[in-house]
């Protein structure tokens, strides 16, 4: 009831052929095939690069954080309050 039958698909295909012509559809099909081939090729190249990069990442470097030194030039909070009182 809600599906598309074979006869409806044939009617749609014949309308598409009449509208676009066989040459244009043939060119469209070859372009689609070439793009799928290129996609598969790039995916296989990506798999090869990830396998070599995983070998490199297995030897991680040891990163150490630099020691945090407290700042010696901090003024006492009492001195800061006294300076504020002098300005008032």
From Swiss-Prot:
One of its GO terms (molecular function) is protein transmembrane transporter activity. Residues 49-62 have a biased composition (Low complexity). InterPro entries: TatA/B/E (IPR003369), TatA/E (IPR006312). Residues 39-88 are annotated as: Disordered. It holds the Pfam family TatA_B_E. It is a single-pass membrane protein. GO terms for biological process: protein transport by the Tat complex. Residues 78-88 have a biased composition (Basic and acidic residues). Keywords: Cell inner membrane, Cell membrane, Membrane, Protein transport, Translocation, Transmembrane, Transmembrane helix, Transport. The keyword Cell membrane applies. Coiled coil: none annotated. It is found in: Cell inner membrane. The chain crosses the membrane at residues 1-21. GO terms for cellular component: TAT protein transport complex. Part of the twin-arginine translocation (Tat) system that transports large folded proteins containing a characteristic twin-arginine motif in their signal peptide across membranes. TatA could form the protein-conducting channel of the Tat system. Belongs to the TatA/E family. The Tat system comprises two distinct complexes: a TatABC complex, containing multiple copies of TatA, TatB and TatC subunits, and a separate TatA complex, containing only TatA subunits. Substrates initially bind to the TatABC complex, which probably triggers association of the separate TatA complex to form the active translocon. This is Sec-independent protein translocase protein TatA. It comes from Sodalis glossinidius (strain morsitans). The lineage of its organism: Bacteria, Pseudomonadati, Pseudomonadota, Gammaproteobacteria, Enterobacterales. The gene is tatA.
């Amino acid at each position: 009831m809600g599906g598309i039958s074979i006869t409806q698909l044939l009617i749609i295909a014949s309308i598409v052929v009449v509208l676009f012509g066989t040459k244009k559809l043939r060119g469209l099909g070859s372009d689609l095939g070439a793009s799928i081939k290129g996609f598969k090729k790039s995916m296989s190249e990506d798999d090869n690069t990830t396998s070599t990069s995983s070998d490199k990442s297995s030897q991680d470097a040891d990163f150490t954080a630099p020691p945090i030194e407290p700042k010696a030039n901090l003024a006492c909070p009492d001195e800061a309050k006294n300076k504020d009182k002098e300005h008032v």
